[in-house]
Swiss-Prot record:
Gene3D superfamilies given in the database record: 3.30.300.30, N-terminal domain of ligase-like
SUPFAM superfamilies, sorted: Acetyl-CoA synthetase-like (SSF56801)
InterPro entries: Ac_CoA_lig, ACAS_N, AMP-bd_C, AMP-bd_C_sf, AMP-binding_CS, AMP-dep_synth/lig_dom, ANL_N_sf
Matches recorded under NCBIfam families: Ac_CoA_lig_AcsA, PRK00174.1
Annotated family: Belongs to the ATP-dependent AMP-binding enzyme family.
Subcellular location as annotated: Microsome; Endoplasmic reticulum
A molecular-function term among this protein's GO annotations: AMP binding
Protein name: Acetyl-coenzyme A synthetase 1
A cellular component term, taken from the record's GO annotations: cytosol
Amino acid sequence: MSPAVDTASTAKDPISVMKSNASAAAADQIKTHEYEHLTSVPIVQPLPITDRLSSEAAQKYKPNLPGGFEEYKSLHKESLENPAKFYHERAQLLNWFKPYDQVFIPDTEGKPTFENNAWFTNGQLNACYNLVDRHAFTQPNKVAILYEADEPGQGYSLTYAELLEQVCKVAQILQYSMNVKKGDTVAVYMPMIPQALITLLAITRIGAIHSVVFAGFSSNSLRDRINDAYSKTVITTDESKRGGKTIETKRIVDEALKDTPQVTNVLVFKRTHNENIKYIPGRDLDWDEEVKKYKSYTPCEPVDSEHPLFLLYTSGSTGAPKGVQHSTAGYLLQALLSMKYTFDIQNDDIFFTAGDIGWITGHTYCVYGPLLQGCTTLVFEGTPAYPNFSRYWEIVDKYQVTQFYVAPTALRLLKRAGDSFTEGFSLKSLRSLGSVGEPIAAEVWEWYSEKIGKNELPIVDTYWQTESGSHLVTPLAGGATPMKPGAAAFPFFGIDLAVLDPTTGIEQTGEHAEGVLAIKRPWPSFARTIWKNNDRFLDTYLKPYPGYYFTGDGVARDKDGFFWILGRVDDVVNVSGHRLSTAEIEAAIIEDDMVAECAVVGFNDELTGQAVAAFVVLKNKSSLTAASESELQDIKKHLIITVRKDIGPFAAPKLIVLVDDLPKTRSGKIMRRILRKILAGESDQLGDVSTLSNPGIVKHLIDSVKL
């Protein structure tokens, strides 16, 4: 390969304000690790699937890539060299109300471009029809949703016919009781229950746009997302259940809506039937009462291929959450293809994604992907630790799950709990295991393979993002690609990866490469924009390295062609697979009257992958020396509670360090790199600190962390 960016163009200053931060962080990260050992990690070939199946099941099984790795390489090459042909053939897997004119808007070489990123132009379809109607017509009694409630033994199933009826009734509530129109945004703040999926499907059925907010966010965060999307309608529950605890979702919504004047209606599903929940007449509607008013069928609204399907807010390095906007046709197709090929989905499969619909994993691989394929999706309301650490494996055996997809954080928790919780379960129904949200450490990968996969199952260690909509780098189940413990492996179809030098932007070639991960051209499910802020979309993703999509992650490629994801190189922390903006957390802390300055960074954590650390300077600096230890602890607890209330419990700092000052350059910029190094125990590897205006602060910071 030859460099895609010439030295003349890369010698200029970057046009994005964030490139200097990203390149410095990436360069620092790369210098502090040795990645040459990755090549020595052994390649693992899973046992052929037919060897693990009964003779009857083996006869029925038809792999989606029967030609294995060679077929993958051939199809991947075709998806890059002839994308129009590749995607046109596979677009027939969707049902269209109106055929499209062309697959994408091509450049002079017949390839898609970031500048004109539109797919299946002038075609019309409907997401809900593709997820529900077509399967309800052909296999009405097939189970679409299996629901496992927080409490064991509670739950139920919905067939595709039953799902269609419930979706149609909620769609009519939206249209006629709540006056939701095509193109309106609808905010969804719900737990992992079937009604959450029904809600999303009903919204898409009428051509509206869903904006799901994770039901762990605070009222302030919910308010900000409702206002940014200008949602006039909110759908929620009275309460929710998780890990044996009750969460007051309706109360949180009510608090958020004190500052959302545009909201006219709230639809409430009664999950717990708590009679003490307050309802506001004229605004709040009872789900159970409303569904009684409407008939069991209403037609779908055709929408253009590029019609916005949903918004999903993700953390940004500048603090304010970004409403990532996905279009309909391209997202649907790539979600379907990733289900088909990554997981080697068969029609009778039961797919269990242990992820929340408040994040992209729940969107693509709990809702859209499985239902597009016409298989069964399992919705789990609870946690892996309630009522005990065997819960996941009980569910797998109970429902005969065929694919299990989970974040490494949960696996680390279960590994730490002890192997006894994995014993006594068959797990024979499983055909593949998945990992999502963050890189999985080799030792966790090996535990997952041995204890859950019996050293027989493929582990698809998937790398992707809210912005990508579906998998970017992943092994393929069904024995289609080899694996290495801890490696994301190979690019998915349509994904043209590049490893760039973080400073120059020049593509790194050769057997071994390290740098930042970028992508050379768009793919169907690539996000179209940031809601109402396309300039921010360009500045964040396309301007840091012109001609490329900048993922924000560091990467290494070994001599065997495997890609290894090395973590964030921007000011985003990945905690338990959740991307959190350090700037947003800093803003929450600085709002407190006692705080003068704050710098938030991530540090390695054995359980959550990364954790949040906040270095805080108080306005009254004398209190650091005058206060007792218990008073200092009270200050720290107060600041943690502040973040929990302003953003959500999952964003709370694990470590707060009260300091006299922060390390700053002469221009006043905080050198967060120094803070990260100190937390990593690398105080002897701080690098160039000559630009510090207060070099004496370094020893104070080191001593403060040790306390």
